[in-house]
């Protein structure tokens, strides 16, 4: 009788362990196909059955209950830069819904216009919740771009303060030739923080780090960034996480508490990752914030575009992600998930005393348990409940799920 009881206990233990292992296996499930050049997916606060997908050509599409609606939510293709060759960094780049979207119907777009300026504008939804009014555009901010790359473009409302955060790259070309990212009189190479609920078209929050310094732009929240293509806030801790695309050798992830981010200098062009860039040796790192993680830029995007196999390389363009705070994948709780655009690799880690721990290469696991996986990771996204999605630039939206 005792022997049977012991065997039963062992069997139950092994069964439980097997269930736990299976429950911890991650997969991605395709939510919907969307038009190619997909750049971002998001959801307004309180929404449950619709996802909004940003398209570089100038449209925002709606996925409703797994189906992509044929008519775009908004189409401003007549205003965005139209020459979108492979690898182009212009077009419609950012989307954020106002925290009170359900009441005021406001949302914000960041795009590069036909005159090569970055434009951040507010639009309004119509009485039809699936259609916005293109004619309601109110330009909030315009910024001439000296070159056609490193435009940044991401928009996000702070989860705690409700301010609008805007990411801009250094203005492009090789090595930030004008040193914009270290110039506090320039809005390039920085993340801005503005109040769109006060002032016309906006006001500067009283606690912005440079608000009382005349020689510095008061909109700047943090700087020293080459191309912060995607950044995010941990919705639980308010930590700021930035995927900053590198120059030649290193891609980097920055992770700071919100309080430490005020006025933070992330180092570009003095540093690329944790390494001196300009000057190449003996650079002065005083006051610079070093990335918590870096990986080598060793994949050729041009080779990938023409079909050559570069998938064994690590990557060439970091895509910043999110700290998972959803309920469907509890083993991911508190884990930062991010990837690389060129190789489709997806990684995760958590932070302990400023150091990355529990690092995982998720792509083999996802390939094993998923019907298919994204190839060109242009963005990650969250829904209103904190569940995590990934965007394939070629035109598909995937959701992270547990393989059970």
Residue ranges of each PLM-predicted region?
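A conditional alpha-helix N-cap/helix-loop micro-motif detector
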Residues: 31, 145, 221, 369-370
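Beta-propeller fold detector
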Residues: 29-30, 69-78, 131-141, 203-209, ...
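Short, conserved catalytic or adaptor-binding loops enriched in Gly and charged residues
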Residues: 21-24, 129-133, 210-214, 285-286
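Bacterial Sec-dependent N-terminal signal peptides
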Residues: 1-24
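Conserved blade-ending motifs and adjacent loop-strand segments that build the rim/top face
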Residues: 225, 356-384
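Beta-propeller domain segments
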Residues: 46, 57, 85, 90-92, ...
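Acidic, Gly/Ser/Thr-rich repeat motifs that build Ca2+-stabilized beta-propeller blades
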Residues: 23-175, 230-233, 238-246, 250, ...
